[in-house]
Amino acid sequence: GLCPDKYKRYSLQHSFCLPTCVSCAFYSKDVRYWLKNYILYQHNNLRNVVASGRSYGVDHVPRICLTVVTRIGCGYLFRKYTNVICNYGPRGNVEGEEIYKGGDICSACPANTCCGDGCKYHGLCKFGEPNLPEIFYCGFNGESDCR
C-alpha cells in the first residue's frame, strides 16, 4: 500500500519491511536488538563488497546505513510471526547510486564528525549528535518525538 502524504517527509521510498523474524518477541526491546544486529550485518556486508572493488546498488537496508540517516522508527505486527516495518530519514542515496566509495579510512568524513582511534567505531565517520535517539517511537506509549 501507499503511505499517506504526511509520512512522506523523508522521501517517496522511505520505508521497508524486514524479513519475518520468527524469534522476535512481541516486546519492542527485542525487536530493537534484532533490528540493530540486522542493520550491522548488512552494513558489514556492504563494506566487504566495496572493499573487493565491486559496486553495490542501493536497497532500503543499505540506505539506512548511511551517515546522513539520523532517524529510524519501526513498528511491528505480531501474529504467527513478528513482522517489522521501518521508516527512516532524512533521505540518503537513491536507488542505483553507490553507497560507499573506496579510499583511505576517514579521508572523506564530513566536518564535525568523529573518525579514528578516539571514536567508538574506528574507521567510520560518526556525527556528534548525542541528543538524537537511535530509534524513535510514534504513538505507541503516548510519548512521541514524531512530527
Curated annotation (Swiss-Prot):
Tissue-specific expression: Expressed by the venom gland.
Keyword Lyase: no
Residues in coiled coil: none
GO cellular component labels: extracellular region
Subcellular location(s) of the protein: Secreted
Main location group: secreted
Record's keyword terms, sorted: Allergen, Secreted
Similarity remark: Belongs to the CRISP family.
Protein name: CRISP-1
Native source species: Phoneutria keyserlingi (Brazilian wandering spider)
